[in-house]
């Protein structure tokens, strides 16, 4: 028997026409990424469910109330005048003063209401106003030369008149009967007299009449206040306030132009000294005083009325 042997060929060396299907790498990667995104979405959804289950643990989702006191901006903004309070905030003191004076001139009833309702000026505020006028007067002097020359006088004449006019206007406000407290009147006159002392003595005699007149008016004001102060509480304000020394000093600085005030003070202190000596003399002085009151018909005029028949 003739047997034919064929050579053995390994399978991997055979020409295999059946090939395994090729896989698309791009589609595989997209599918994997899709699964990954789906897993992430599922996880995020679970987190959202867990967060929504306890809203108190997430303060970001709570509504915040609008802070009080804040005004919402108007959506329909248009031009309009300022409210009166805002307008007054923009005015300077001079502008405010000019505005009030203009309104009062047109409406006298408003002027009277302002005078009656405005707070009374204090000594400090009034002296501060006078100090501003004095500073303006001093600043008007020219540089160089004598401060008492005619040229300097002509340069500061307007400021000098404004200062003296302010003294004339403010002084009556602190005199009785408008001012009932002697201490207040005396304190203002003390500061106002110092301002007159600081006025220069001009080279020309006629130019000094402003200062002379200011001294005369101030001396009369001192006399009025001293006379009224001597009537209240036995003149204790004059006795123990040291005003005798202050007025004597003012008279010395002015060159004797405050003599009227000095004489009034001497008369008041002399009367009070005589009353003190009479009260210390004892009963005879008291009896003589009663006799003089009986003869003049003034006995009991100053005593309080009694209650009852006797």
Swiss-Prot record:
Binds the proteasome. Residues 52-63 have a biased composition (Low complexity). GO terms for biological process: nuclear protein quality control by the ubiquitin-proteasome system; proteasome localization; protein transport. It is found in: Cytoplasm; Nucleus. This is Tethering factor for nuclear proteasome sts1. InterPro entries: Cut8/Sts1_fam, Cut8/Sts1_sf. Residues 14-32 have a biased composition (Polar residues). The keyword Cytoplasm applies. One of its GO terms (cellular component) is cytoplasm. One of its GO terms (molecular function) is proteasome binding. Pfam families: Cut8. Keywords: Cytoplasm, Nucleus, Protein transport, Transport. Coiled coil: none annotated. Residues 1-85 are annotated as: Disordered. The keyword ATP-binding does not apply. Involved in ubiquitin-mediated protein degradation. Regulatory factor in the ubiquitin/proteasome pathway that controls the turnover of proteasome substrates. Targets proteasomes to the nucleus and facilitates the degradation of nuclear proteins. Belongs to the cut8/STS1 family.
């Amino acid at each position: 028997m003739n047997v034919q042997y064929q050579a053995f060929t390994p399978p991997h060396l055979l020409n295999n026409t059946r090939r395994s299907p090729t896989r698309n790498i791009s589609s595989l990667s997209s599918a994997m990424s899709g699964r990954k995104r789906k897993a992430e979405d599922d996880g995020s959804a679970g987190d959202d469910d867990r967060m929504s289950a306890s809203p108190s643990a997430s303060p970001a989702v709570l509504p915040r109330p609008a802070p009080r006191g804040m005004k919402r901006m108007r959506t329909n903004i248009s031009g309009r005048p300022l409210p009166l309070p805002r307008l007054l905030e923009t005015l300077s003191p001079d502008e405010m003063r000019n505005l009030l004076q203009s309104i009062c001139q047109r409406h006298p009833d408003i002027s009277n209401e302002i005078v009656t309702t405005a707070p009374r000026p204090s000594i400090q505020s009034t002296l501060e106003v006078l100090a501003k006028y004095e500073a303006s007067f001093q600043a008007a002097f020219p540089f160089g030369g004598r401060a008492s020359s005619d040229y300097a006088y002509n340069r500061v004449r307007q400021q000098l008149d404004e200062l003296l006019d302010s003294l004339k206007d403010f002084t009556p406000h602190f005199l009785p009967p408008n001012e009932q407290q002697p201490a207040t009147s005396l304190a203002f006159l003390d500061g106002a007299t110092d301002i007159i002392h600081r006025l220069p003595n001009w080279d020309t005699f006629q130019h000094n009449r402003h200062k002379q007149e200011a001294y005369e008016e101030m001396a009369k004001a001192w006399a009025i206040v001293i006379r009224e102060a001597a009537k209240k509480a036995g003149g204790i304000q004059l006795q123990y306030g040291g005003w005798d020394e202050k007025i004597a000093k003012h008279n010395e600085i002015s060159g004797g132009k405050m003599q009227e005030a000095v004489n009034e003070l001497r008369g008041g202190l002399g009367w009070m000294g005589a009353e003190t000596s009479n009260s210390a003399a004892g009963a005879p002085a008291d009896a003589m005083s009663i006799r003089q009151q009986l003869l003049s018909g003034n006995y009991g005029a100053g005593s309080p009325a009694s209650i009852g028949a006797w």
